Structure formats: C-alpha cells, structure tokens
C-alpha cells in the first residue's frame, strides 16, 4: 500500500466526514511553488493553500520572522498583554490600505472572522441592521458569512436558517447576461420592496468575485456603490480576503478603482501561511 493510501485510510477513520478534500494526496514537503506527496511525487502547487501562499512555501524571510517570534513570545493574547509585532503590522497595513482618512487595523484569525467583525463594526457605527451582498460572492463558512455568500451549492445546503437582514443583488456577469444596470436595478428594488436605505448598514463586495468565477467588479458598479453609500450613509466593505496582497498586481485590488471602501477585510496571504486576518 502506498503512503498516500495508508494515510487516506487513517484519515477516513479519524477525521470528520464533513471536512472535504480535493485530492487523496498527502503533503510531506513544500518549497517555493512545489509540493511533494507522501509517495515522493513532486507537483507544481497552483492551489497555494487556496490563495494563501503568495510568497511561496517556506520563504526564507517568512520562516526567519516566524522563528524570531517563536523564540520570543508564542502567545500572550493581545487583549491581555499586548506585544509590538501586532502594532508594527497594523502600522504597515495602515500606511498601505486604500482608505480615506486615518486607517486603523484589528487582527483576528480567519477570513470569516474578519468579515464578521467588519459587519459588526458597520452595524455598530451606523446603528442599522441591513447588509447587501452580491450573487456569486463568497465571504466564509460561519453562519453569518454563509448568509452573505451568494451561492447555495456547495456551501449553504442544509445549514440554514441564516441570519436575518441580509439581502442579495445580482452581480454583473456578461456570461450570465447580467449588466451593471441590472445590478443597480436590483438594489433599487431592494430599497423599494425589502429594506429602506436608512436601515442598511453596509454593502459588502469582493473587488474580484472569487468562487463565483474570478470576475472583476466593474469600475462603474464600484463607483455607483460608493455614490449610494455617500447618499444614504451606508458603509462600503471591500472583502479582499482572496483578492488582496498583490494577487491582482497591486497590494489591494481596491487600488485599481478610483473610489475607496470604508472597511477592508484581509486574510490568507497576509501572513504567508500562518492563521491571521484583519
């Protein structure tokens, strides 16, 4: 029996069935853009931990910084006893984030946590409940972020009901016959039939729709959303968990637009393979 097959048998016996796998190959070593399985076969890694390894596997600068932190403090909980690297990274992100005014950063662990906290901040700031997301968008697998996600299969089947006050408009996609005008009409209809704008806390959108087909948000839609936000006191959340950290040629995908978001979520390649989001 191969090492992969043996590990697969152990995996079936020990790991919950709800954890899916794209392959039955087990990673034992990785370097740069290559990864080796338990049987010694070498592969080019186009998955990158699902958009996490933008700097490649085991980048020496990333490895050195991880070791430096392990040699100092592994964990103290920033809310109990703060530490400088948290502040240092926040300062670096604040310098680079395409946000009007003074930017500030908080860190959590996963992309879904980042999105949940962005929604919490938007609701607390505006004192409104509603959030409008878009068809095809993906925002995470917690209950709230599944509610925001604009795809039923494969994520949402069997997990409802989802939180209230979440609404969806179609995302403009030429292959689906949906234009920017159609999307804006959907939003107008939501305002007319489902939730008045004075009860909407935020729009949340990916600058590049990921799980919905890797489709960039048209600039005219981003400008229209910014205008609606400014008109009605709504916040614009750019979910950059997948699109951030130079995956589009700029550090943030929002840098391709001539408008700015109020909140930006980050994760994945933010930490070169370590669990960190903000």
Question: Predicted regions span which residues?
Answer:
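Conserved N-terminal phosphate-binding loop of PLP-dependent enzymes in the Aspartate aminotransferase
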Residues: 1-278
